[in-house]
Amino acid sequence: MLTAELAAALARVALANVERAYPRRLDQLLVAPDAEWRPRTLHPAFYGSYDWHSAVHMHWLLARLLRLYPELRERASIEQTLDRHLTPEAVLRELAFFSAPGGTTFERP
C-alpha cells in the first residue's frame, strides 16, 4: 500500500534520477557522424535516469504522486523540476526527435 511516507521516499528517488544524466544507456540510431548524442541536448525533457524510457516513467511517477498526495512535503521540488523539464521548447525538441530518422525505435511511439 502506498503511504505518504513511501510516496515521499519514491519522490526523492525520482527527483534524484531525473537530474542524473550519467550513467546513460543510449538507444537512438545515429545517422551521421556529427549526430547529437549527449542526453541533455538530445532529450531536454527526459535526459535523466538510466535511459529515456526510465526518465519518462520517473516524470510520470512525480506527477502521479502530486495527484495522489497533494500535501507531499516534496511538492515544491517536484513542481519546480517538472516546470524546468517540461517546457514547451523541451517538449517540441522531444517531438522533433520522433520525426527524425531512427526516432521511432525501441520503446518509443
What are these language model-derived features?
Residues 1-4, 8, 48-56, 72, ...:
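Alpha-solenoid helical-repeat scaffolds
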